[in-house]
Design a protein with these regions (language model features):
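Loop-helix junctions at membrane interfaces
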Residues: 2-8, 12-224
Length: 224
């Protein structure tokens, strides 16, 4: 005894210390979680690619450019809701950028796409997980409300920034004449708004349908 404080018996201390087997199990679970996240990130990137490449409606614009109606951005947001802003943003940016790189019409937009889609995921993920904590136990009304708000935040950012970034990118990086770049940006803004409205509906409907299925299967991840 030292100053009235008794030291626990060695056997008791041994019980309190995690065993090597327990530590290995914890590390293995962490590795499994990481692998699952990477697999799901790749899956969401593939869905973004497919949604843009095969489910888009191209719209030629004055000045020789082309914009499109598509739901690729919806999967960027859905990835952020399921995986968090970081992994979700990477999934969206990779999937959509690869789609641009493999399409001669959109290949010059790839750098812009990578940045904007990453931001969509980061913003939607921040609202969903840092503000609303939607992966915790809440009623369906709360989940629907905040998945809607997160979608509006991420896709709303894109509605504002896509034409602005697109204008400067085409004008200063690609060397497109200012007046032509403005016309292209205006057309792109209209298509981006339609995509955002449709995308928001898709995100909320799909997330509300997929969430209980993943929970029942034990595959739903809680994002802190």
């Amino acid at each position: 005894m030292i100053s009235g404080i008794q030291r626990l018996p060695e056997k008791s201390e041994a019980v309190l210390r995690p065993t090597k087997a327990a530590r290995r199990m914890i590390m293995k679970n962490r590795e499994n979680d990481k692998v699952y996240k990477l697999v799901l990130t790749a899956l969401m990137a593939a869905l973004c690619y497919v949604a843009f490449t095969f489910l888009k409606i191209p719209i030629p614009t004055p000045g020789g450019d082309t914009t499109a109606l598509h739901i690729g951005n919806a999967f960027c947001v859905l990835a952020a809701l399921l995986l968090g802003g970081g992994y979700g943003g990477v999934a969206g940016s990779l999937g959509m950028t690869i789609a641009d790189l493999l399409d001669p019409v959109y290949i010059t937009s790839a750098p812009k796409t990578f940045i904007l889609k990453l931001c969509i995921g980061l913003i939607a993920g921040f609202v969903a997980h840092k503000i609303a904590h939607i992966t915790e136990d809440h009623d369906s009304r709360y989940i629907m409300k905040w998945s809607l708000i997160a979608s509006v935040a991420g896709l709303g950012f894109n509605v504002v920034m896509d034409p602005i970034v697109g204008y400067f990118y085409k004008n200063y990086i690609l060397g497109v004449e200012s007046s032509a770049a403005k016309i292209m940006a205006t057309w792109a803004a209209g298509a981006t708004l339609v995509n955002a409205i449709v995308g928001t509906i898709v995100v909320v409907v799909v997330y509300m349908a997929v969430r209980p299925v993943l929970k029942k299967a034990g595959l739903f991840m809680k994002i802190k």
